[in-house]
């Protein structure tokens, strides 16, 4: 049986590795990406079921989300962006760039299955 692929973009060990482990526990294959310049191309090449994007990484993360949205081959993929609880500006910028869901790290940790269900039922 082929397990669905999730791409997780992160630089920070926590919560990135924790998210990877939780997704693997839910039977996802996980591809970790740590360079925002490669995120759109990797997404197009690997065709994941969904993406998680850590907004606290260095580089143009919202630009990477915009590239994913602008490409017909990837524009339909759910993007869940997350940031520390106090980084509301980063969450708003990610939503404007096209992230389907924007959540705080505490919400991500506590409600992963619910977020997956919501992301995979978006139009």
Walk through the language-model features, giving the residues of each.
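Acidic, metal-coordinating helix/loop segments flanking the phosphotransfer/catalytic sites
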Residues: 35-50
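Output/docking surface of receiver
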Residues: 98-110
């Amino acid at each position: 049986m082929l397990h669905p692929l999730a791409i997780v973009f992160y630089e920070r060990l926590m919560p990135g590795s924790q998210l990877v482990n939780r997704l693997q526990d839910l039977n996802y294959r996980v591809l970790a990406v740590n360079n925002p310049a490669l995120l759109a191309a990797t997404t197009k090449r690997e065709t994941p079921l969904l993406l998680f994007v850590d907004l606290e990484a260095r580089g143009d993360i919202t630009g990477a989300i915009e590239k994913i949205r602008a490409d017909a081959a990837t524009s339909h993929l759910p993007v869940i962006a997350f940031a520390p609880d106090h980084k509301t500006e980063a969450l708003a910028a990610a939503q404007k760039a096209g992230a389907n869901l924007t959540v705080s790290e505490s919400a991500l940790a506590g409600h992963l299955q619910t977020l997956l269900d919501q992301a995979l039922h978006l139009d």
